[in-house]
Amino acid sequence: MKQRIIGLDVARAFAVIGMIIVNFKMVLGKQGAEWAQLVTSVFEGKAAATFVVLAGVGLALMSNTAFHNNDLQKLKQAMVRITKRALFLFLVGLSYMDIWPADILHFYGIYMFLIILLLKAKPKLVFGTALFLILAYPLMMLIWQYDTGWDFETFEYSGFWTLEGFVRNLFYNGYHPVFPWAAFMLVGLWFGRQDLHNASFIKKT
């Protein structure tokens, strides 16, 4: 039986709690006591990013034995499992977009498809790809107008269900676009490929 990494479980718990708090704030509005607004602001942006990183770590741990042993058959099995999960999350997320436009699940599914492409890759390539996604985003903002499709008074996105609008929202200016958000999951994959039971590595990071 594999030894659980308690720190990851604790981090997941905090990330989930943080996402719940942030989503409640979005639904119920920003009015309330100043201390409550201050507490919720601590989680904004951080909880979702942390959860995506931890998802990448989880996918790494799921495939680490096969990866380090260069077991192509087991890596293929892991890729099939991840593909099924990615497709499920993508479709479920899209199914309630009209109810909850800020959904992260369909983005999550696309991040996982990118993970599949890099599941056999060396950690340096994984980290380099994450860095590319981060650095490319400001350049994209110089080329394409960020607010295309958005009405920031109502937070409605026009043309979402068109091919152009969907791709733009998914990769560039949605709530959690692939550029740069997929980098968080790739960093998690890179981190999970390291020896997380090595105390000296944990202290360095």
Predicted features along the sequence, with ranges:
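Alpha-helical transmembrane segments and their immediate juxtamembrane cytosolic regions
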Residues: 1-205
